[in-house]
Structure formats: structure tokens, C-alpha cells
């Protein structure tokens, strides 16, 4: 299809509460919303890089610049035959996975819409709903955490992720497991630890966690260090920040760096890479699950479509809009369709697009391209 029009919006979205992780406190998130048009039809996509280069080297300022100055000019007015064709045209740019994903994801949504298929069908998925989990950041007290966990259990969420950082670590897990002895939990360290902390992770084995997500720093030694750690502990290691691409996951499998992989569609460069990674992991008996970057309902809906692929077997980080946002820019908002479940699209592409008034109010910068 020929790309007739392209609009890129850098948007700042206020969160409903202060979200606390090992990276610090977060009161808002920033994201890239992309509108792509071909032959009178259009679709929206989303890629949500961090707004500071903490989670990754890429961040919103650089992502927007790369999209506006380098990537969008390469595809506007061009006949793009496939998602791989689009990726090939952008291959001259190293890294910048969030920027690459912004265009590739939107291409997938538009192509599905033009073909009259819900996005999950275009990707090869088949489920009409997917299981989702609940996540809790660092809380002001253990009592507050227990109250929130009980609410999530009562609401039917099948698993809970707990943020884990120095000062909110072993004693927190011990208290949670004591109160909820049989529920499925895992922890997310957000790369806050080093190999010197191996004994801490060995102590966690007794608490029967589903996994430890990204325990060690994402640096040049990351895959080797995680492989060494996995040999020394029983709890499965899950890679997040270190699983940057299909090639990174191939290396992780060869080294034995993990037993689980978290796939964030934008972090790995889009839906094509996400699909390929989950297929590769399936070949090696490694389960996958969908991670989130605090996307709006637009990105969240796309994540739900991706989660229908067969090797996404652990409930994903796909949240009802009301969890992180008082007013989600994406409409219709994401809601639970059952106990711990989100429905997938019943219309071509996805149903979500931004509210026009909120888009105008919250846009930081906008770049527009026309043939």
C-alpha cells in the first residue's frame, strides 16, 4: 500500500497516581501516537518509549526526532508491500527500536483494517480474549500493598507482579507470601541489582515465585551475568530490558540466560519481531508474556491482539484504562471483559483511536507528512 499521509504526535499523559519502581517515581508518561493513511483509510498505532533514558538508551525526545527527521521521510509516498518491506527501508538506522516500532506497528494495524481483519487475525492469533495480570509498584506501607493485592485477587486477576528494589525486597516478598501462600506472584527488579546480589536471589527460591524479571543490570555483560545467575538459582529468570531484539533473544537462549521472556512490542522493534521472538522461544520451550510501557488504550489494545499468539502463555501487562489513567486518551477505553481478561478486537484493525480534544491538549509536538 502507498503511504499517503503520516502524522506523529509526541504526547504527555498524566498518570492517576505516583508509580514507583527502581527507576524512580513517575507521575506521567510520554508516548508516540501515529496516524497512517492509505487510499482513504487510516489507522492509529502507538510506541511508548521512556521519557528519560533510564529503562533504555532511547527516550521520547530522541524517538520523536528520529521519526520526524529520518524515518518518516523514508516511507511517505512509498508503496510498502509488507511490514518487512517497511523494516528494510529503515534498516540503515541502528537501534532506535521504539521509533522503528511506531511506524511498523501502525502499518500492521492499517494493513489489517484494509484487509477487513481484526489485528490479531492478521498476526496469526485466534483468541477472542486474553488473560491479564495486576501490577503493583513500591507502596507507602506493607498494609497498603496487602490491601491492593487482596483487591486484585478478589477481582479475579490470575497473577500479580510486584516491583522489587533495594529497601522493598526480601521482607516484602516474605510478607506477601505469608499472607497469600498459594497465589501466583513474580517480582520485577528493573535491572536494579548486580551479580554481587546472587545470595539475595537464592533466598527468594523458598517463596516459589513464578519468575524474577530482569534482576541484573542491562549492560554489555547482561546476558552472561543472567546466565550465571540462572545456574545458581531455581526460580526462573525472565529477561525484559536485555531482550532488545530477536538477535538478543537468540543469544540469551544459546547462553542459558533465562527461562522466560517478556516481550514489549516497542522495545523489540515492532510486531514482526515480537511474533518472531515468541515463535523462537516456543521452539526452545521458553514461555513468553506481554510487557507494558504504560501505553494508552491504543497501545494496550494492540498488546492484547499480540497476546493471542500461541506462546504468550503467562498473563500479560495489559491494564484496564482506569488503572493508570483518570482519563485515557485512547477511546474506547480498555475494560475487563471477565475476571482477569481483556477482549480482543471484533472490528478490522483495532477499535481504539485518540480523543481529539485530549490529543490537542496533551500534544507536546506534532509532525505531519503528506504526499
Across the structure, where does each feature detected by a protein language model lie?
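Catalytic core of soluble alpha/beta enzymes
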Residues: 162, 167-299, 328
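Structural signal for conserved beta-strand scaffold positions within catalytic alpha/beta enzyme cores
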Residues: 134, 262, 317-320
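A generic structural signal for well-ordered alpha-helical segments
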Residues: 111-112, 230, 281, 307
Amino acid at each position: 500500500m502507498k503511504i499517503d499521509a503520516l502524522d506523529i504526535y509526541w504526547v504527555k499523559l498524566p498518570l492517576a497516581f505516583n508509580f514507583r519502581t527502581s527507576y524512580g517515581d513517575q507521575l506521567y508518561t510520554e508516548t508516540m501516537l501515529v496516524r497512517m493513511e492509505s487510499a482513504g483509510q487510516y489507522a492509529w498505532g502507538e510506541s511508548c518509549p521512556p521519557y528519560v533514558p533510564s529503562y533504555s538508551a532511547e527516550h521520547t525526545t530522541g524517538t520523536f526526532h528520529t521519526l520526524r527527521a529520518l524515518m518518516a521521510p523514508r516511507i511517505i509516498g512509498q508503496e510498502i508491500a509488507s511490514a518487512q518491506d517497511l523494516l528494510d527501508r529503515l534498516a540503515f538506522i541502528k537501534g532506535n527500536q521504539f521509533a522503528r516500532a511506531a511506524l511498523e506497528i501502525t502499518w500492521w494495524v492499517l494493513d489489517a483494517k484494509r484487509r477487513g481483519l481484526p489485528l490479531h487475525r492478521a498476526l496469526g492469533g485466534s483468541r477472542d480474549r486474553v488473560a491479564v495480570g495486576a501490577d503493583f509498584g513500591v507502596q507507602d506501607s506493607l498494609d497498603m500493598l496487602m490491601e491492593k493485592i487482596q483487591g486484585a485477587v478478589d477481582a479475579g486477576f490470575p497473577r500479580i507482579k510486584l516491583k522489587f528494589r533495594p529497601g522493598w525486597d526480601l521482607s516484602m516478598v516474605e510478607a506477601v507470601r505469608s499472607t497469600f501462600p498459594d497465589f501466583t506472584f513474580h517480582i520485577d527488579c528493573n535491572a536494579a541489582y548486580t551479580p554481587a546480589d546472587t545470595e539475595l536471589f537464592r533466598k527468594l527460591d523458598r517463596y516459589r515465585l513464578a519468575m524474577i524479571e530482569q534482576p541484573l543490570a542491562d549492560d554489555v555483560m547482561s546476558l552472561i551475568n543472567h546466565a550465571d545467575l540462572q545456574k545458581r538459582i531455581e526460580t526462573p529468570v525472565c529477561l525484559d530490558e536485555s531482550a532488545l531484539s530477536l538477535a538478543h533473544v537468540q543469544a540469551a537462549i544459546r547462553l542459558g540466560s533465562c527461562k522466560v521472556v517478556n516481550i514489549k512490542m516497542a522495545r523489540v522493534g515492532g510486531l514482526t519481531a515480537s511474533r518472531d521472538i515468541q515463535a523462537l522461544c516456543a521452539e526452545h520451550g521458553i514461555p513468553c508474556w506481554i510487557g507494558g510501557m504504560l501505553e494508552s488504550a491504543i497501545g494496550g489494545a494492540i498488546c492484547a491482539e499480540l497476546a493471542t499468539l500461541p506462546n504468550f502463555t503467562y498473563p500479560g501487562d495489559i491494564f484496564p484504562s482506569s488503572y493508570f489513567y483518570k482519563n485515557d486518551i485512547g477511546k474506547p477505553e480498555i475494560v475487563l471483559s471477565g475476571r482477569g481478561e481483556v477482549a480482543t478486537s471484533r472490528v478490522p484493525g483495532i477499535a481504539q483511536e485518540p480523543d481529539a480534544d485530549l490529543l490537542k491538549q496533551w500534544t507536546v509536538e506534532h509532525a505531519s507528512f503528506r504526499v
